[in-house]
C-alpha cells in the first residue's frame, strides 16, 4: 500500500490491520470461554464495549514468509500476539469484570533451517 514510510524504503516484515471491534465471546485469562456483555450500565448510563485489535493481513506477505527475511537460512511466518484486558463478561449466570484475550500485534516468527 502507499504508506508514507514506503517512500523512504521502510517496510514492515508483517502487514497488520487495526480496528475497533465488538465481541460476543472471548477467552478469559483462565482459558474459559466467556460471554462479553454488549452493553455496560454505569451510573444509569449505557455504554457499549469496544476493543482495539490488531491482526495480520496475511501470514505470508512474501512467498517465502515474512518480508525481508533471508529464506535461504530461515523459515518465517507472520502471526498474531495477544494480551489481556478487562471486560464485563458473563460466565454462566455470574457477571463480572474479567481479563479477556485480544490480539494486539502481528509479528514475524523465524526458525533456522536445518543444515544451516
Swiss-Prot record:
One of its GO terms (biological process) is cell surface receptor protein tyrosine kinase signaling pathway. Disulfide bonds join 14-78, 56-106, 66-108. It comes from the Eukaryota. It comes from Naja atra. It is found in: Secreted. GO terms for cellular component: axon; dendrite; extracellular space; synaptic vesicle. Coiled coil: none annotated. The keyword Disulfide bond applies. Belongs to the NGF-beta family. This is Venom nerve growth factor. GO terms for molecular function: growth factor activity; lipid binding; metalloendopeptidase inhibitor activity; nerve growth factor receptor binding; toxin activity. SUPFAM superfamilies: Cystine-knot cytokines. Not glycosylated. Its main location: secreted. A 1,2-diacyl-sn-glycerol binds at residue 86. PANTHER family: BETA-NERVE GROWTH FACTOR (PTHR11589:SF10), NERVE GROWTH FACTOR NGF -RELATED (PTHR11589). Keywords: Disulfide bond, Growth factor, Lipid-binding, Metalloenzyme inhibitor, Metalloprotease inhibitor, Protease inhibitor, Secreted, Toxin. The keyword Transmembrane helix does not apply. Nerve growth factor is important for the development and maintenance of the sympathetic and sensory nervous systems. It stimulates division and differentiation of sympathetic and embryonic sensory neurons as well as basal forebrain cholinergic neurons in the brain. Its relevance in the snake venom is not clear. However, it has been shown to inhibit metalloproteinase-dependent proteolysis of platelet glycoprotein Ib alpha, suggesting a metalloproteinase inhibition to prevent metalloprotease autodigestion and/or protection against prey proteases. Homodimer; non-covalently linked. Interacts with NTRK1. Expressed by the venom gland.
